[in-house]
Amino acid sequence: VTTSTQTPAPPKSGFNLRTPWNSAPRAARWGVVALCAAVAYLLPNMNVPLLTTQGTDWPTLLFTISVYVLLALGLNVVVGFAGLLDLGYVGFFAVGAYSVALLTSPNSDFGLEWPWLTAVFVAIVATMISGVILGWPTLRLRGDYLAIVTLGFAEIIRVLASDPESIFKGDRGISEIPHPAPFLKDSDGNPIFGVTDARPYYWLGLTLVIIIILGVKNLDRSRVGRAWVAIREDEDAAEAMGVPTFRFKLWAFAIGAAVGGLSGALFAGTQGFINSASFELLFSILILAGVVMGGSGNLPGAILGGVLIAYIPERLRGIRTPEWLPGNLGNQDLFEWRYLLFGMVIILIMIFRPQGLIPSRRRSLELKEREKEVIVGE
């Protein structure tokens, strides 16, 4: 009796941007990256009519986008690379912001009045330590149980910050937080990081985004990144193969927390004032939605997701509904409906593009394998 096996044909796929990109010479790829970076730095000085609407401060919006991208990159390390569902990421954002506020503001109960730059390093260390403290007893949990614990962490931070008798001063908040690098002056002797021009803050945020991208990309290619992938795909199998899963999950939590703390420090130094209303749970959900929408586990996807969740609501500002709509629907600012419209966009993306707008190659393969399992099960 003879048996024959037939190798199944590889699945067909449409156009993939990765193929021409990976086959291009290295110098050409670096040239494209440098060109994109140059355009990004020039964006505040560009008047692009289709990108802005009436009432939108373009440089301020760009700075907001840079903060959201930083947060998306940090959460992508936890959710996308290591596969740990974190619903309380805004807690680390708050720890970083309040660390800077307490150490630098003259209105702080500490009264230290440190320089902003010095306080940033302390804020990063503080958030990294808070990530380790949270992760050490909880990272043995998985899935929904871990998500509930992280959600509780964010609520604890919010409740503490809402107490008017605490050092965080509740809704009164902490004011007079110094701006970054007050020693830098322009030709007229005015501080570069002032209150009227948001461009320097955007350039600072963009520089931090580039630094974090380079750092996370190197981590993804290292032994740590390979361990994260193994944990995300099958933690039990990874542990059976000798991967110290708990240690690498703790690394992911600490690194993600540090990036969140850096984002909070940048936010506090730019706003000059923070209170408990700045760190609601909805913020965590938005960042998580951006990571999933852009493409979990992929740096370009996380960047795109961060851009979209910051840009889409602001793009609606100043656009009004037609007057002929019935009832109170006519002549309404679409900005008031931003969460409804943004939710509809997310639903459509998850229906037609469940792997995200720019999925990682690994994520695409995982979804294909799951589709095959569903077909076989049927």
Regions found by a protein language model. Name each.
Residues 2-378:
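Transmembrane alpha-helices and adjacent helix-loop boundaries
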